[in-house]
Each structure stands twice: as structure tokens, then as C-alpha cells.
Amino acid sequence: AMAAAAAAMCRLDEHLDLTKRGGRVVCVGLGSGALPAFMARKFPTAVVEVCEIDPVVAEAVRGFHGLNPPKLLGPWGDKPVPGNLPPGVGLCMGDAGEFMEKAARAVERGDAPLASVVFLDAFDGAGEVPSHLTSKDFLEKCDRVLAPGGCVVINLFNGPAGSVQRRRLETIAANLEAVVGAVTTFPVEFPVNVVLAARKERADGFGDQEDPRFTRKELKSAGREISKELQFEWDAGHFLKKAYWVETEGGASFKERPAGLSLNPLSGFVNRMGTAMSDEWAREQEQEM
């Protein structure tokens, strides 16, 4: 869902279409290597930079997904410059906060291009996204690297309404909205995860587009179009057809509504919609553990 959301959102912005303009993709967290490898394989003119702090993870990924060996970069000093890389995957071992700060400075000096997408798919030993990577301070660094109209895409653990996981997700959504721009959520096949995507505002707005967020219809169509064109192994539109627009009112609340659909806000049906994990699904998971 992360790759699907990013590919479709960039496709819908003529200035950032990865199929036509190459571009720069930054991945915070290597994980299994599947995400950066997929982006590099399907968008061969794009520069895909990965920041990973754990050498064990990096070593485990070598030999998989065509990342054998990845281009090793850093540790970052003033040079080499983040962003000044040939197409393909480059790996930087080190702290993500330091990496993003130096990447932002490089952009501001004019030594590196802006990024079309920043992916955040990093988890600690306890299976949680480190809190400093979802703070306003870190997201501001991401925003400094991001091109206008570009997106920050985050993979998070989900939970039932009112759960610790869900409250944290709501806080992160509020931070994203405050720092980067309008937020859209995407459910995944199994509700244990949810994807958040924030689109950066443009200084001059978005022209004739009344809302900077994309509708379900637009996302689904763009996803299916790009999947067919680039021969994805799966239908990106399938992952995007249940997108939700998020409204946080500055962190005072958290509401999801079907992206681009007009529904009666007083309807009880609206309150049952969204990406929150159902209580029944959560109970089933607990019983299996």
C-alpha cells in the first residue's frame, strides 16, 4: 500500500510523475528491502536513498531483491551530498535524524534535488516506530527535503478505536497535517497496519484543484493505470479504493471520511467507517497469540 499510494499520488501531480521525471525517493528504514527494491525496479530513472541504522538488518538484506550489494554511502559528512547519486538504490548507515538534517541542508544549499516521496517504514526491536521519527521536529526535516506536492508516506501499526496504537496514530496524523499537509489514510489487507500519506502544500496552492487531497476515484484510476503501464505484479488501484481523508482540527479530534465522497455527517454509518481495527478482529488476534 505504501508504494501504491506514493506512485498514484505522484502520477496525479504532473510535476512529480515518477514515470516521466525520474525523481528522488527517500526511504527511512530498510526493512526487508522490498520497498526500495520495488521502487528502483519499477522507476529505473529514480534515485532511491535508504537510511538504516541497524547493520544486522542491512547485512540480512544483502543478496535479496537485487540489492547485492547496495551502493554504500556515508557516514554523512559535508560530502558526499545526500541526493547527488546516480539512479538506483543507495544505502546510508546511520541515524535517520542526522541523515534528514544533512539532506535538508544539502537541498537548501542547492547541492541536492528535492524528493518526490519520503517513506517512513522503520520499527525498533519492540516492533514500534521510534517516537522521535514521528515527532514534529523530524517531520519538519522531511518537509524541508520534500518537493511541493510531494508526499510523506508512513507505515504504522493499527489498533481498535481508543487503543494505545490508535491514539498514537491519531497524534502522528495531527503532526503530519500540521507540518507537511493534508493527510489521507489507506487500509491494508490485514488491519494490523495502516498507511498514512501527507501531501505537501504548494506556495501558490494547487491551481484549479479545490482540495489538495485526491479522491478515491482519482487514486484508484491512477493506481490501475500505472500498474498496467509498468506491469506491477499487483493492482495498485485495489489498495487505494478505500482511501480516507483525515481531519484533525489541529489535533483536537480525528475524523476519517471516504476520500471525495459526500455523506451525511449525522449518519451513524459514517461513524463506523474508517481504518480503525474492529474489536472483533483484535480479539481474534489476541486469542491466536
Predicted regions and their residues:
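SAM/dcSAM-binding transferase cores
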Residues: 22, 109, 184, 193-289
